[in-house]
Amino acid sequence: MGAIDKHGYRFEPEFSVISQKGAIHVYKNGDFVEEITFSFNGKFPVVDKIEQLVDEYCHKKGI
């Protein structure tokens, strides 16, 4: 999965299969804002879960 651009923000997911953990790095105008962490099971995180985390973040922050 690649980056998600939404409302002027860029969300770049990355993950480790070994540790079963991931993070979504949030950027605004190229500047790092914060990191959203998550865990998952299997070989890859579910794309829908990443999109849901981004949507929840935007809603919570009023973006």
Label each PLM-derived region with a short phrase.
Residues D31-I63:
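Mixed-charge, Lys/Arg-enriched low-complexity segments
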Residues M1-T37:
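N-terminal acidic leader/helix
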